[in-house]
Amino acid sequence: MPSRNSINKPKDKLQRNSHASSIGKKRSARARNGIVTKSSTPRYETDSNAAPKATESKAIALYNGATTPTGVIINNTLSNKRSKKIARNKKYIAKRNEKLNIDLLADQEQMEVDEETEKEEQTKAKNQTKLDKIKEVLWAAVEDRVSEGLKVSSGTDGNGTTLGVQAF
C-alpha cells in the first residue's frame, strides 16, 4: 500500500486522469466549433489562418535606408517596445551632440578672445613706462604675500600648538 504522501495513490491517479481527460475534451470541442487561434493550435504548428493572441505584439520591419544590392530578403523585425527605445535613444544622442557642439563653439570663441587679449597685453607692455613696471612688480609681490595665507611658526618644540602636545 502506498504511503500517505505518495503521488501514486489510486485516488489521486483517478482524479488526475479525469481532470486531464475533461480538459482534453473541452479543448477538442473548442477546436471543432470555435475560431482557430494561436492558443488553440499546437505551439510549433505554422498555421497562417490562426488569429493572433490578444497579448501578441505587433512587429515593425527594420529598414536602414537603402536596400541591399544582393537581393536577399531579410526578415529582421522590431517589437514596438524596442522601436520606441531606439527612437528615445536617438533623441538623447541628438541632444547630447547638440550640447557638445555648443560647448565646442564656446571653446573656440574663448580661444579667439584669449588671442585678442594677448595682443592687447603685448601692446600695453610696449607702452609701459618704468614707473608702471615697478608698480606692477610691487603689486604682484603684495598679491603673492596675501595668497600665501597665515603661517604659524611652531618654534622648536611645538608646545602650545596642535602640532605638539595638546596642553592649554
From Swiss-Prot:
<keyword id="KW-0813">Transport</keyword>
<dbReference type="GO" id="GO:0042254">
    <property type="term" value="P:ribosome biogenesis"/>
</dbReference>
<dbReference type="Pfam" id="PF09135">
    <property type="entry name" value="Alb1"/>
</dbReference>
<dbReference type="GO" id="GO:0005634">
    <property type="term" value="C:nucleus"/>
</dbReference>
<keyword id="KW-0690">Ribosome biogenesis</keyword>
<protein>
    <recommendedName>
        <fullName>Ribosome biogenesis protein ALB1</fullName>
    </recommendedName>
</protein>
<dbReference type="InterPro" id="IPR022784">
    <property type="entry name" value="Ribosome_bgen_Alb1"/>
</dbReference>
<keyword id="KW-0963">Cytoplasm</keyword>
<comment type="subunit">
    <text>Component of the nucleoplasmic and cytoplasmic pre-60S ribosomal particles.</text>
</comment>
<feature type="compositionally biased region" description="Polar residues">
    <location>
        <begin position="36"/>
        <end position="49"/>
    </location>
</feature>
<dbReference type="GO" id="GO:0005737">
    <property type="term" value="C:cytoplasm"/>
</dbReference>
<comment type="similarity">
    <text>Belongs to the ALB1 family.</text>
</comment>
<keyword id="KW-0539">Nucleus</keyword>
<feature type="region of interest" description="Disordered">
    <location>
        <begin position="1"/>
        <end position="56"/>
    </location>
</feature>
<comment type="function">
    <text>Involved in proper assembly of pre-ribosomal particles during the biogenesis of the 60S ribosomal subunit. Accompanies the pre-60S particles to the cytoplasm.</text>
</comment>
